[in-house]
């Protein structure tokens, strides 16, 4: 009985240590959700403004720009996948990878060669373990992304997209770049603390929607400098802004998923502590009962031997 009590006491100590760790991780994840939500809210006005300006430029000027004009034939499509750098986040990265895999399968079915760009160690590990090619990868900022991180990713994607596909038989062509004709992004939308949804969206070319104009005077725009120069300056910022928005929303989703996973682990630790405590108390009770029985039995034996004398 004593050995069993020692084992159970050690299990209780282990469960309590695990509970401290999971509770701390839950609190950290909760604080990061709030920070990421603030980043999302702060980025929205800029994203709306730059989208409105670009829509006005594209609608009021007949301009052919690589980031605006769909290619006649899409030979290769780039896919940017956002996953986490660390584990213990439930199905966050797994669900994003599943969405990316579905997109890659659709692209192949349409006769398009996919080129994969991955953010986060979990995504990189998934594809490298399976010997799947990755065109470029970035790690180390999935939980707390900055606009500088988004700009670094955006520079690579803009370069390959503006280059287009002009290679053949493994030769990158005169520009030395294995370009793409289309850009997609797979990220995770933050709906609430309990709901996050992986989504796949078109990143390039920019999709300009023809919105109905209100009755009355039509708005007049004067571009200074010329519309072409403005597009050259603003379209890369638009791509970077889209990537940054996806990064911060995915960061909020990752933290929410990790918080949920850690809360579940914390609840399980509490249940384990209660279970092992009950078992330890039962074992101690059984040990005490056995000792009392042995004492009573010994006393009865002594009494019996004394009466015989």
Curated annotation (Swiss-Prot):
InterPro entries: ATP_synth_F1_ATPase_gsu, ATP_synth_F1_gsu, ATP_synth_F1_gsu_CS. It is found in: Cell membrane. GO terms for biological process: proton motive force-driven plasma membrane ATP synthesis. GO terms for molecular function: ATP binding; proton-transporting ATP synthase activity, rotational mechanism. Coiled coil: none annotated. Its main location: membrane. It is a peripheral membrane protein. Keywords: ATP synthesis, Cell membrane, CF(1), Hydrogen ion transport, Ion transport, Membrane, Transport. The keyword Transmembrane does not apply. GO terms for cellular component: plasma membrane; proton-transporting ATP synthase complex. PROSITE patterns: ATPASE_GAMMA. Belongs to the ATPase gamma chain family. F-type ATPases have 2 components, CF(1) - the catalytic core - and CF(0) - the membrane proton channel. CF(1) has five subunits: alpha(3), beta(3), gamma(1), delta(1), epsilon(1). CF(0) has three main subunits: a, b and c. Produces ATP from ADP in the presence of a proton gradient across the membrane. The gamma chain is believed to be important in regulating ATPase activity and the flow of protons through the CF(0) complex. This is ATP synthase gamma chain. It comes from Salinispora arenicola (strain CNS-205). The gene is atpG.
């Amino acid at each position: 009985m004593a050995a069993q009590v020692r084992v159970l006491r050690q299990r209780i100590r282990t469960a309590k240590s695990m509970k401290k760790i999971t509770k701390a991780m839950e609190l950290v994840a909760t604080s990061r959700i709030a920070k990421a939500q603030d980043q999302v809210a702060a980025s929205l006005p800029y994203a709306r403004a730059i989208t409105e300006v670009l829509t006005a430029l594209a609608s009021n000027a007949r301009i052919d720009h690589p980031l605006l004009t769909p290619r006649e034939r899409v030979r290769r499509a780039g896919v940017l996948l956002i996953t986490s750098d660390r584990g213990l986040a439930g199905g966050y990265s797994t669900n994003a990878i599943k969405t990316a895999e579905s997109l890659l399968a659709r692209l192949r079915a349409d006769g398009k060669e996919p080129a994969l760009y991955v953010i986060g160690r979990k995504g990189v590990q998934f594809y490298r373990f399976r010997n799947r090619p990755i065109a470029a990868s970035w790690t180390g900022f999935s939980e707390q992304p900055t606009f500088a991180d988004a700009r670094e990713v955006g520079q690579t994607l803009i370069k390959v997209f503006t280059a287009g596909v002009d290679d053949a038989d493994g030769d990158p062509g005169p520009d030395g770049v294995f370009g793409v004709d289309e850009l997609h992004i797979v990220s995770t939308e933050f709906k609430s603390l309990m709901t996050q949804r992986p989504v796949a969206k078109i990143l390039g070319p920019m999709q300009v929607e023809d919105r109905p104009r209100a009755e009355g005077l039509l708005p007049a725009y004067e571009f200074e400098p010329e519309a072409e120069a403005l597009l050259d300056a603003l379209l890369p910022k638009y791509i970077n802004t889209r990537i940054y928005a996806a990064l911060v929303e995915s960061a909020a989703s990752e933290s929410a998923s990790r918080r949920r996973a850690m809360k579940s682990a914390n609840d399980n630790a509490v249940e384990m502590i209660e279970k092992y405590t009950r078992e330890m108390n039962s074992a101690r009770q059984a040990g005490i009962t056995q000792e009392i029985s042995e004492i009573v039995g010994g006393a009865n034996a002594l009494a019996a031997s004394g009466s015989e004398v």
